[in-house]
Structures are given as structure tokens and as C-alpha cells.
Amino acid sequence: MHKEPMTKYGYEKLSKELEYLKTTARPEVAKEIDSARELGDLKENAEYHAAKEKQSHIERRIAELSDILSRAVVVDPKEHAHNRVAFGSTVYLIDVDTDEKEKYTIVGAPEANPDKGLISYHSPLAKALIGKEVGDEVEVNLPGGVKVYEIDKICYEDICFS
């Protein structure tokens, strides 16, 4: 079984989602199926088929989350020195060409949300950053072309998934 690092925040978020699906969503959809079943003929019962589809989606997500969480190795970035970029680090970068500032936090793949600055440690940018120090320049091949960044700051920041 391949273990995957995950921040404690990502682990908590996925654990809460799994708990909700098991304790709330699953029983609710079971009631919907029972109610639709009482309407009669199941072949042409749109409510029944919609509820069964919803149930299938919930069960797939429960299985997916259970698998992800069973393989997770929770990493607390607070325990690491932040003189070098590592898993869980928040990194402030300066685009060398434009002087624009960007901020990214390196997280596990299931937690990644590039639109919110949460990048997977598998991503090209994270791979280029890991192990580097403040002042280092990194060159990254991105879909839009080659980018060069200077590392301005490395720290730990709490992650908010909302």
C-alpha cells in the first residue's frame, strides 16, 4: 500500500466529510429510496432512480475517502524548521520577470487546490521548490512556459479549506 503525506488540516477535512457521508448523507438517501419505492412501479419511478444514483455517488465517495485516509501519513509542518522548503511549507515567491508576488502551500495530492494556492507536492512547481532556501531562484516548466521565481519567504501557516 502506497502511503501519501497529508497535512493534519487535509486529514481533518476529509475525515469530517467521510463522517458526514456515513452518518448523515447515507441514511438520508436510504430514506429517499424507501419513500420513492412506496410510490410503486420502480421501472418508471424517476425519484427512485435519482435516489439510487445519489446513493451510488455517496458510496463511491465513501470508498474513495476511506482509501485516501487509510493511506495517509499525517505530517505536521509545525514540527519542521522552515529554512528550506518542505512538505507543508508556505512559500512566498517573486516572479523574476514580472515582480509579481505569489504564495503557495505544499500539500498532499487530495488536498491540492491550485486556485487557493494549495499545490500538490507532486506538481512541477512543488518539486522545483522542495529543498530550496530563501533567495534561491527556481526555474519551472509550466503549461504556460518556463517561469523563474525567487524564494522570498518560507514559513508555516494554518490552512483553511473553506
Swiss-Prot record:
Protein keywords: Coiled coil, DNA-binding, Transcription, Transcription regulation
SUPFAM superfamilies, per database record: FKBP-like, GreA transcript cleavage protein, N-terminal domain
GO biological process: DNA-templated transcription elongation; regulation of DNA-templated transcription elongation
InterPro entries hit by this protein: GreA/GreB_C_sf (IPR036953), TF_GreA/GreB_CS (IPR018151), Tscrpt_elong_fac_GreA (IPR006359), Tscrpt_elong_fac_GreA/B (IPR028624), Tscrpt_elong_fac_GreA/B_C (IPR001437), Tscrpt_elong_fac_GreA/B_fam (IPR023459), Tscrpt_elong_fac_GreA/B_N (IPR022691), Tscrpt_elong_fac_GreA/B_N_sf (IPR036805)
Keyword Coiled coil: yes
GO molecular function per UniProt: DNA binding; RNA polymerase binding
Record-annotated disulphide pairs: none
Coiled-coil spans in chain: 44-72
Function: Necessary for efficient RNA polymerase transcription elongation past template-encoded arresting sites. The arresting sites in DNA have the property of trapping a certain fraction of elongating RNA polymerases that pass through, resulting in locked ternary complexes. Cleavage of the nascent transcript by cleavage factors such as GreA or GreB allows the resumption of elongation from the new 3'terminus. GreA releases sequences of 2 to 3 nucleotides.
PANTHER family named in the record: TRANSCRIPTION ELONGATION FACTOR GREA (PTHR30437:SF4)
Family: Belongs to the GreA/GreB family.
Protein name per UniProt: Transcription elongation factor GreA
Native source organism of the sequence: Nautilia profundicola (strain ATCC BAA-1463 / DSM 18972 / AmH)
